[in-house]
């Protein structure tokens, strides 16, 4: 919310849609009243509404400041092929592969958020490129891919009584190795 005045100043025709939980009156009390007509609260969305929402926007911004263990909302946005700008939470960095599938801004830094959002909104070719990249990145989360990874883990842990250790601090399944220590 703190980044909105600068974003709107840079893009005076922008319409801001806010989806998710929260009391609009509580959120808007700290927003300059002159900006109120530019902001629409949609509340919680059904799965179909969420897909329509993502397909209707030029840029999805995920300004989360914590509490994300995976970042499923980013995977959902990626599947619709929308350009993404997200806070650099660990979960979001992992889903976006450190910026490969979308751009990141410093968590809780409204100046960085406003700067990066304004730059993306001013650059339709960059947004189009990010949208294509995010759509490609979403394929990692398709059910056949995930099911294959799950089967690989089952095969790995049930094989020959050998020990299994994790080779990565990020606990990705693809980093599991067989037969080394504890």
Give the residues covered by each predicted segment:
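A short, well-ordered alpha-helix in the C-terminal region of glycosyltransferases
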Residues: 112, 126-140, 152
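Short alpha-helical segment that forms part of, or immediately flanks, the ligand-binding pocket
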Residues: 51, 74-79, 90-94
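C-terminal alpha-helical cap of glycosyltransferases
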Residues: 143-181
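Nucleotide-activated donor-binding/catalytic signature segment of Leloir-type glycosyltransferases, i.e.
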Residues: 27-48
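Glycosyltransferase donor-sugar binding loop
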Residues: 1-2, 15-28
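Short hydrophobic beta-strand element within catalytic cores of glycosyltransferases
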Residues: 59, 83-86
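Conserved acidic donor-binding segment of nucleotide-sugar-dependent glycosyltransferases
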Residues: 98-99, 103-110, 119-124
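Short alpha-helical donor nucleotide-sugar binding micro-motif in glycosyltransferases
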Residues: 44-45, 52-57, 72
